Amino acid sequence: MLHIKGLCLLGVRTVWHTEGDGEFFCAGCGGDRGYRRRTGTRRLTVLGLPLLPRGSAGTVVECVVCRARSGPEALEQPTTTVFSAMLRDAVHTVALAVLTAGGSTGRAARETAVEAVRTAGFTDCTEDQLLGLLAAIVADEGRFPGAAGSLPADGLADSLDGCGSWLSIELHEALEPLSRHLAPQGRERVLLQGARIALADGPYLPAEREVLGAVGRCLGLVGEDTARILEAAARTPS
């Protein structure tokens, strides 16, 4: 800029235009805040008046509280509300998957699953709700006609076969988006919760190991880490 006696004769100013707004996670504030999505245009100014355009200043996301500006990629980070819901759904899906693989006759496994789901955020979850949902899944799958009121004791291990199975789809949809926002310790903790459900009524069944292996893959864990976590859980007294 060109100044003479404190007066700006010539310079460049960025003019911002708001294109949208919403809620996002502001790293500067450390929580959920409102934002404005803004696009800037640089203009040549003479005596403080914007005249000729000098190109685009790009698009930014501006926090309405701290005014900090970030790139549009800041909107890819889920808000704490959305993240909590993703984590809650993930634990719920893992609990259902483990119960499905191991059968639902073990009371200890059912109680451990209910406790995990409640801790994750479904505070009013009951055994009857979990069993009802499992029975509905079985009936919808069509593998056990008329099974809306009960589950086979050996679970649905065969539902794991093939990427088109309901179990594979549910695990991928619930875990893969979440894994991108979890630290390694967080991904391991989700797997560990599933392991504790499986171990609540005895050693791992083959189908339970298969399910937990699928959980680990959906969370982005390598096979060695998944095996290490499962073995460590098996050695830990309940």
Q: Language-model features: where?
A:
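Small-residue-enriched hydrophobic alpha-helices in membranes
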Residues: 1-100, 104-238
